[in-house]
UniProtKB/Swiss-Prot annotation:
PROSITE patterns: RIBOSOMAL_L16_1 (PS00586), RIBOSOMAL_L16_2 (PS00701). Belongs to the universal ribosomal protein uL16 family. Part of the 50S ribosomal subunit. NCBIfam families: rplP_bact. GO terms for biological process: translation. This is Large ribosomal subunit protein uL16. Residues 1-17 have a biased composition (Basic residues). Keywords: Ribonucleoprotein, Ribosomal protein, RNA-binding, rRNA-binding, tRNA-binding. One of its GO terms (molecular function) is rRNA binding. CDD domains: Ribosomal_L16_L10e. It comes from Kineococcus radiotolerans (strain ATCC BAA-149 / DSM 14245 / SRS30216). Residues 1-24 are annotated as: Disordered. Binds 23S rRNA and is also seen to make contacts with the A and possibly P site tRNAs.
């Protein structure tokens, strides 16, 4: 799973969800990609689950790129704890996704298998996504 080795601050504010993605909006490495249509948070477990869904479907034929990284900690207080007494402990790591961001890329010879693999990965993600192709017709 994707987890930062070390961070400057163990607990952070929640990232903002406003606005569209400014970078990472095109398919640059592979031939096909998963683009977010809406914004939200994606955890490290969801990223790993989507990666496994893609790699199991394509087997050995292609290559997968993950363009997002969960670098923000999300905290949670224990169950049945009274309010107050500080912020909870870091529970999981999230990546802030904005609309238009290409999250995964895939290069594979046949389009049918590539789109099926990316569709399986989309079902694992909590944000609405669509499959995009590399521009330029290569």
């Amino acid at each position: 799973m994707l987890i930062p080795r070390r961070v400057k601050h163990r607990k952070q504010h929640h990232p903002t969800r406003r606005g569209a993605a400014s970078g990472g909006t095109r398919v640059t490495f592979g031939d096909y990609g998963i683009m977010a249509v809406e914004g939200g948070y994606v955890t490290n477990r969801q990223i790993e689950s989507a990666r496994i869904a893609i790699t199991r479907h394509i087997r050995r034929g292609g290559k997968v790129w993950i363009n997002i990284y969960p670098d923000r900690p999300l905290t949670k207080k224990p169950a049945e704890t009274r309010m107050g007494s500080g912020k909870g402990s870091p529970e999981w790591w999230i990546a802030n996704i904005k609309p238009g961001r290409v999250m995964f890329e895939l290069s594979f010879p046949t389009e049918k298998i590539a789109t099926e693999a990316l569709t399986r990965a989309i079902h694992k993600l909590p944000v609405k996504c669509k499959i995009v192709r590399r521009e330029g017709g290569e």
